């Protein structure tokens, strides 16, 4: 589902992705606060699908903000093989691993997932796990609650 929000003019490019972290103190008195923050869920990764041309003033973003249309971003993560079923809806839990230097660590412990997601596809590439975990790389879409 597409949502309307505001984002810094320098960041407002179709195709860009961001993780919404919530409002800042500086946002409190702003007249645009509701459109900036009320449509987005904290911790969710969004993709910009369209950008409007008008620029609006902002105390946080030096060059102002633009109105953008966003939707939850589809992205790739790694999960345990037994959970990797196309079309299934899951509540995210990171792969149990503390090897922060592993090349797969960020995919096994992704940012920008809050709550549930749907497995849109299982990717064919093989995932090597140094701890011996059976893992799969998948594409997911967050489920809006």
Swiss-Prot record:
Pfam families: UPF0179 (PF03684). Belongs to the UPF0179 family. HAMAP family: UPF0179. This is UPF0179 protein MmarC6_0993.
């Amino acid at each position: 589902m597409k949502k309307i929000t505001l984002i810094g003019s320098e960041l407002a490019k179709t195709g860009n992705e961001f993780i919404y972290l919530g409002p800042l103190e500086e946002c409190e008195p702003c007249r645009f606060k509701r459109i900036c923050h009320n449509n987005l869920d904290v911790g969710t990764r969004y993709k910009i699908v369209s950008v409007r041309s008008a620029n609006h003033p902002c105390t946080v973003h030096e060059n102002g903000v633009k109105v953008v249309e966003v939707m939850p971003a589809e992205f790739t993560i790694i999960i345990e093989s037994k959970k990797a079923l196309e079309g299934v809806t899951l509540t995210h839990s990171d792969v149990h691993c503390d090897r922060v230097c592993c090349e797969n660590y960020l995919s096994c412990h992704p940012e920008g997932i809050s709550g549930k997601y749907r497995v849109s596809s299982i990717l064919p590439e093989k995932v090597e796990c140094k701890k011996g975990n059976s893992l799969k790389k998948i594409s997911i879409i967050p489920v809006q609650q």
